[in-house]
A protein has these predicted regions:
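Mature N-terminal segment immediately following signal peptide/propeptide cleavage
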Residues: 1-3
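Short, well-ordered secondary-structure micro-motifs within conserved domains or adaptor modules
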Residues: 6-26, 37-38
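Feature activates predominantly on carbohydrate-active enzymes
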Residues: 22-210
Length: 211
């Protein structure tokens, strides 16, 4: 609390966090008065959203902890609240105007744990629960994100983003059955192509739980 708000709780004050499965999985209930605060959530993510709500309300109220009061219960109205990055694996960003990617460089996945953790925390603080890390215009090395070549690094991303309630998504290459699978066609109406995609999806979900 001190690291986030700048002041420690005085003796006798407290913040209690608990699960209440009657709440929406991403919902929370926040109550605070007389130096005591309770945060309940429908899941650990719901509790996390409640913590961010507490910090947000503290900052906007402009009151000392002893005078701070809150009584709110909220849940997201939209199930998917997602950011779509157009990052390329060479480190460039299509239509990006503020620097290079911090996900990719030279066809490799960057694992900057402090920076990624700070980013995941920032996303959760405003209720973002999904992120696509690569450009929707998939080409070159990005086509291979759904293979063993990159599964290890993506597992590290899941370890970072999942605790903050942020689900990881990947943009895929329509021509992957041809480029990766050596098939003559990428026609989704072709049963062989559909079977290839089904197998690739199962492989991805098995090695990247939560993807």
């Amino acid at each position: 609390f001190k690291g986030l708000y700048g002041a420690a709780l005085t003796e006798g004050d407290d913040i209690t966090m608990a699960l209440d499965m009657a709440l929406d999985p991403e919902g929370y209930r926040l109550k605070a008065a007389d130096g005591h605060c309770t945060i309940e959530g429908g899941s650990e993510v719901g509790v996390l959203y409640g913590v961010f709500a507490l910090l947000r309300n503290l900052q906007t109220a402009g009151k000392a902890w002893a005078q701070f009061t809150a009584d709110e219960e909220k849940a997201p109205s939209n199930r998917l609240r997602m950011l779509n990055h157009w990052d390329n694996m060479d480190g460039s960003i299509e239509r990006g105007y503020s620097g290079d990617s911090f996900f990719f460089k030279d066809s490799e996945i960057l694992i900057d744990v402090p920076r990624l953790t700070a980013y995941a925390r920032m996303l959760a603080s405003v209720g973002i629960n999904g992120i696509t890390i690569n450009n929707v215009n998939v080409k070159d090395a990005a086509s291979w994100l759904i293979t063993d070549r990159y599964f290890g690094a993506l597992q590290e991303y899941l370890k970072i983003f999942t605790p903050y309630g942020v689900k990881l998504y990947l943009s895929i290459n329509f021509a992957a059955p041809m480029e990766l699978g050596g098939m003559d066609s990428a026609d989704p109406c072709d049963p062989a192509v559909a079977k290839w995609w089904a197998g690739k999806a199962q492989e991805g979900w098995a090695k990247l739980p939560g993807l």
